[in-house]
UniProtKB/Swiss-Prot annotation:
GO molecular function term, any single one: mitochondrion targeting sequence binding
GO biological process, one term: intracellular protein transport
Annotated region (Disordered), positions in chain: 43-62
Gene that produces this protein: TOMM20L
Gene Ontology terms: cellular component: mitochondrial outer membrane translocase complex
Keyword Transcription regulation annotated: no
Highest taxon of source: Eukaryota
Keywords annotated in UniProt: Membrane, Mitochondrion, Mitochondrion outer membrane, Transmembrane, Transmembrane helix
Protein name: TOMM20-like protein 1
Source organism: Homo sapiens (Human)
Length: 152
């Protein structure tokens, strides 16, 4: 009957052989890959394509014309919110101020400004309305995406 020590030695030897075989296979594949004449060309092409891809993504993320339109929309929504609040229509004013929060680049800062400028009651109403406005915005965006995807 084999002892536990001999069984452990056998298991350790098998593990060492397996690790050695795996390492050898990795070295073999690396040499085969590096020996491929097209490898350096593909690597060079990939390295050249990375900065171009990054530039393309950067231009897609920041478009000055879109930024200007967002600023105009933001200012319009703030003005409409102030107008409705000055008329005593708190619900309409809060709706427009919430829309301004959606398109604002720094919504936390805008909330701080609203906290200091709006009456406490109106500010509380705005805070309670924010999740609903976000849900409505997401639903509108999903609907718009579905309409853009629909070929009809």
């Amino acid at each position: 009957m084999p002892s536990v020590r001999s069984l452990l030695r056998l298991l350790a030897a098998a593990a060492a052989c397996g690790a050695f075989a795996f390492l050898g296979y990795c070295i073999y594949l690396n040499r085969k890959r590096r020996g491929d004449p097209a490898f350096k060309r593909r690597l060079r092409d990939k390295r050249r394509a990375e900065p171009q891809k990054a530039e393309e993504q950067g231009t897609q993320l920041w478009d000055p014309t879109k930024n200007k339109k967002l600023q105009e929309l933001f200012l319009q929504e703030v003005r409409m919110g102030e107008l409705w609040l000055s008329r005593g229509e708190h619900r309409m004013g809060i709706q427009h101020l919430g829309n301004a929060l959606l398109v604002c680049e720094q919504p936390r800062e805008l909330l701080k400004v609203f906290k200091h400028t709006l009456p406490p009651k109106v500010f509380e109403m705005l805070l309670h309305k924010i999740p609903l406005i976000c849900q409505q915005f997401e639903a509108d965006m999903n609907e718009q995406d579905c309409l853009e995807d629909d070929p009809d």
